[in-house]
Design a protein with these regions (language model features):
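Feature for peripheral, non-core segments
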Residues: 1-61, 65-182
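Single conserved hydrophobic/aromatic residue that forms the stacking wall/gate
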Residues: 181, 186-190
Length: 190
């Protein structure tokens, strides 16, 4: 009989590995994928089965905020620019115009790469909520920063309608409740 004691230093949470590959399509992060509303690309019934995040060649993890999808292009564009930035605002990865907008999350630590590297899984920070690692703290607390002020970064409009005037905008306060009803004289959210 054989046994080995495992400490918390040898345990990591993992997620399915989705490598960024030029010419591939990735899905937008949406929390409403279900049997009735599968993801457009992989037909996943759960968010965690959709390809909405990627691991780049430098072991940085990003979430896809936009993939250039439209009503006539529901699957989105192919991704041409590998995300490599580490600033906290969602950004384009390059100048190809592929329509992708990525949000940087974290970098897999070198020690985790050595201990846990796999072709099937990515390690994620074990203590995301309490970590004092400056990089994780910065990402975690970005939503509470005075710069970001918990902004909505992307709005998905299921049925855009027609007859709206371009260039009109209306500022509205969105309060965190179970739902929000907006009535705008310009009928447009920017």
């Amino acid at each position: 009989m054989f046994g080995k004691k495992i400490s918390s230093a040898n345990i990591r949470r993992i997620i399915r590995r989705v490598d960024w590959v030029a010419g591939s399509r990735y899905e937008i992060y949406r929390d409403d994928y279900s049997v009735e509303n599968p993801s457009p690309l992989t037909q996943a019934n759960r968010l965690y089965d959709a390809n909405y995040y990627v691991l780049n060649s430098d072991f940085k993890v990003y979430v896809c905020i936009d993939n250039g999808s439209t009503g006539s292009n529901p699957l989105g564009n192919v991704s041409q620019d590998e995300p490599t930035f580490t600033d906290l605002e969602p950004s384009k990865a390059g100048n190809s115009g592929d329509g992708y907008l990525w949000k940087y999350l974290f970098t897999v630590s070198p020690s985790d790469i050595i201990k846990f590297d796999s072709t099937e899984f990515i390690t994620v920070p074990n203590s995301w909520g309490s970590s004092q690692d400056s990089q994780i703290r910065s990402v975690r607390e970005n939503g509470d920063s005075s710069v970001n002020q918990n902004q909505i970064k992307h709005v998905y409009i299921e049925n855009a309608g027609s007859g709206y005037a371009n260039g009109l905008s209306q500022e509205v306060d969105i309060i965190a409740v179970s739902y929000t009803h907006l009535t705008l004289p310009t009928k447009r959210i920017v």
